[in-house]
Amino acid sequence: MSDMKAIKNRKILKVKTDGTPAETVDDAIAVESQLSVVLNGTSYVTLLCTPEKLEDLVVGYLLSEGIIDKPGQLSRIQITRTHRCEVDVTPEPDLQKRIEAVDSRNPAVFKGNRRMLSPSAESGSDLAPLMASSDVTFPLSALQRAIDTLNRDASIYRKTGGVHATCIASKDGETVCLAEDVGRYNTVDKEIGGCARRGSSFQDKFLATTGRIT
């Protein structure tokens, strides 16, 4: 398990606009770390992330990418102190095919990393729209309750102002889980992975996030 912290304290020079002298003060800084994901011995992707809830992040990423359908396909997931996540997946995915598919769309991208795809792919303009298959509705009060929770409980953001936050909530707005990260995509993956690992159903839940949806 990584022993990195999500926040570091650094001395900064605080420059004021009221004409008073600048001063050196302690400030809380959000940490960004690299996490190299190795699938069945193959280096697949390096994620830039806040170093907490890393297992949830990796599981959510694999689910979002369609590499796995459920957490039960993972026979091992281990975060090392060298910022690697070693994952054993069954059945073994065709990683080379995925890497070649990404390379063919944009040779400059980092292999396997959807967060560095071309602008058209990033915006979703090349994807067919998905139609809702559920008739579940949520009252406005539930949405407001979830947003209030984000504003209140996003502790890293409140200390640093440098991260996004996402929560998954039930029909009445009660938060099931909450995640923070320097990357807005990562917060969603952490939520998906965390809920999936706990066996929570997504059928009657909604997601609230501080990041823009694109």
Where are the regions that the model predicts?
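Intrinsically disordered, low-complexity regions enriched in acidic/Ser/Thr/Pro/Gln residues
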Residues: 2-172, 176-178
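Glycine- and Gly-Pro-enriched alpha-helical subdomains that act as flexible
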Residues: 156-211
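Acidic, divalent-metal-coordinating active-site segment for phosphoryl/phosphodiester hydrolysis
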Residues: 214
